[in-house]
Amino acid sequence: MAKVIGIDLGTTNSCVSVMDGKDAKVIENAEGARTTPSMVAFTEDGERLVGQPAKRQAVTNPENTLFAIKRLIGRTFEDPTTQKDKGMVPYKIVKADNGDAWVEAHGTSYSPSQISAMILQKMKETAESYLGEKVEKAVITVPAYFNDAQRQATKDAGKIAGLDVLRIINEPTAAALAYGLDKKEGKTIAVYDLGGGTFDISVLEIGDGVFEVKSTNGDTFLGGEDFDMRLVEYLASEFKKEQGIDLKNDKLALQRLKEAAEKAKIELSSSQQTEINLPFITADASGPKHLTMKLSRAKFESLVEDLIQKTIAPCKAALKDAGVSAAEIDEVVLVGGMTRMPKVQETVKQLFGKEPHKGVNPDEVVAMGAAIQAGVLQGDVKDVLLLDVTPLSLGIETLGGVFTRLIERNTTIPTKKSQVFSTADDNQSAVTIRVSQGEREMAADNKLLGQFDLVGIPPAPRGVPQIEVTFDIDANGIVQVSAKDKGTGKEHQIRIQASGGLSDAEIEKMVKDAEANAEADKKRREGVEAKNQAESLVHSSEKSLQEHGDKVSETDRKAIEDAIAALKSAVEVSEPDAEDIKAKTNTLMEVSMKLGQAIYEAQQTDAAHADAAADAKRSGDDVVDADYEEVKDEDDRKRSA
């Protein structure tokens, strides 16, 4: 039975895990790392790089290196969050035909789901390489506070990557699974998850295989990226004061600043001070300029103090919704790379009145939880019951633009809820049902998930027709809405059409593009491997010919030289053809056989001569000079006596 993998699709880094017996195992990628940067780059020659290779070239190719794409997934272009993000990244964020936020690289537009799919493909390949078999099913994690559009877009990304997404699971819930799988006694825990781009807080009751989420809260635009940008802004402003040059106008310098900020942030988690040193960051008429600055932990903490404080209100709201006090929380589990920051740990300690639990790896625990959930779905992990909640209230817009809730936030999912509505005018034959998600009292202030028209209502006075609207939330937290005209008995099963999002046709096209790209990537990799093998063979053949060319006939020597030249030509073209290189590699190997044979025979002859010489030396050495003493015979002995 094929394995189901667990993937933590992160803002900054992603991680893949699989059940190995009773334990979740994190799989190392091709570069030997346990996490993979969530970055995709497009080079000048059309090559697509994912993960560490993309990160390595980001400084020289900032406009076509896409990172923190998770912050855009499921968002519209006009969303204030998107507009804020536009000013923070060097790449282009553009408006798609459906109003969604897309990104652009080398003049081509991509949806965030497409870019996320490229990262998921990398995780899929990592798992396949380890398992030695095809992987087609996965459990993917999302921030607990993701809305329906963001969850649907994540599921679309999985489909584009060629994965059947069995379940979308909330990140704090996944972390709780990994933390509490072996815990038998009942506990109330809080999972404080501050990652690269999002913040979640979940309160759970766990014990004896049951994981029940009591409440969840968070901020989908608060994480390590914001901490990095604070430091970038500070470095740029200090440099401007000293040199009078604004580095924020230079995308290449900005990318170098971002990398330096991330490195400094990490170093300050374990040391009190760090030095940022960026030579040749820019230049003016007087010559090149260098940025050198010492940064203390205290200064960094003061720069990001308000960001850390922004996590407190969601924590208090989650505790209130769960009906527990901070003192009643038995354990606070830290998740996400940012929780390594001492100031964050100190804030959590002050808020909950206890030392947070640091026994899990904050970068890997979410992927491990996803793998455990995959094991549950596959039947490999027994006696585990997971009860999650919907993070935001769901409802429809009613008369006067009021948001009428059908399903309150923190309702256990899956769930189904119906409510009867009616018409606002006499003889109204159609109603538009606008579905929203959020906590504000007016529908316009919440996230519009979609709308649909229910037509064919028989003429009647206002308030008479009875229209039953049913909300159905599945275990992934994804919403379906249906409507039924109770007067006529006609039922309308309506699949909600998101106000943005990808259509089925677009997803299908992207799936085909991804498959084509995977094939192109495979061919490119085969080309590189064939080229490496060919260059190695050319080098060894030239060396052998130079040293032993006199051992073969002129005809054979010429054949080898021609084969080397042909293989060199095949390798040196801009778009090497793997099949052509392989064929010419085989030709060179065949014609070189006579040279190899001649070298072997010469070695055999030399070895035979050496053996004969050694034997001759040994036979000469067998003559031994001996000391002797003369022994007189019996008569001589008698006479001398």
UniProtKB/Swiss-Prot annotation:
Keywords, ordered alphabetically: ATP-binding, Chaperone, Nucleotide-binding, Phosphoprotein, Stress response
Induction remark: By stress conditions e.g. heat shock.
Record field: compositional bias (Acidic residues): 622-633
Entries under InterPro entries matching the protein: ATPase_NBD (IPR043129), Chaperone_DnaK (IPR012725), Heat_shock_70_CS (IPR018181), HSP70_C_sf (IPR029048), HSP70_peptide-bd_sf (IPR029047), Hsp_70_fam (IPR013126)
Residue numbers of Phosphothreonine PTMs: T198
Signal peptide extent: none
Region (Disordered): 514-554, 604-641
GO molecular function annotation: ATP binding; ATP-dependent protein folding chaperone; unfolded protein binding
Transmembrane segments: none
Cited Pfam families: HSP70 (PF00012)
Biased composition (Basic and acidic residues): 514-529, 540-554, 608-621
UniProt cross-references to Gene3D superfamilies, sorted A to Z: 1.20.1270.10, 3.30.420.40, Actin, Chain A, domain 4, Substrate Binding Domain Of DNAk, Chain A, domain 1
CDD domains associated with the record: ASKHA_NBD_HSP70_HSPA9 (cd11733)
Biological role: Acts as a chaperone.
UniProt record similarity statement: Belongs to the heat shock protein 70 family.
HAMAP family noted in UniProt: DnaK (MF_00332)
Full protein name: Chaperone protein DnaK
Gene coding for it: dnaK
